[in-house]
Amino acid sequence: MSRSIKKGPFVDAHLIKKVDAAVAGKDKKPIKTWSRRSTVLPEFIGLTIAVHNGRQHVPVYINENMVGHKLGEFALTRTFKGHAADKKSKR
């Protein structure tokens, strides 16, 4: 179920402050955040945001296709190495 239109998108206040400062200062450094729940807004386009995945900060370059999605969607938390091979079938 999606969020109500009348409420608007959710973005953490500290992230908005950092984005505004980066846009005003033309800063190209990645913005480090732990807020995976924040929605990508059109003001974020062209910025690199380092989203925490539980272990490290994954740099995510924001483009226009990402607007409306959550930041956590672009920083995967689980790594799949593949299932163990069956040793009997290899013979």
From Swiss-Prot:
GO molecular function: rRNA binding; structural constituent of ribosome
Biological-process GO terms, alphabetical: ribosomal small subunit assembly; translation
UniProt keyword annotations, A-Z: Ribonucleoprotein, Ribosomal protein, RNA-binding, rRNA-binding
The keyword Transmembrane helix belongs to this UniProt entry's keyword annotation: no
Pfam family, one: Ribosomal_S19
Described function: Protein S19 forms a complex with S13 that binds strongly to the 16S ribosomal RNA.
Protein's name according to its UniProt entry: Small ribosomal subunit protein uS19
Organism, scientific name: Bordetella parapertussis (strain 12822 / ATCC BAA-587 / NCTC 13253)
Lineage: Bacteria, Pseudomonadati, Pseudomonadota, Betaproteobacteria, Burkholderiales
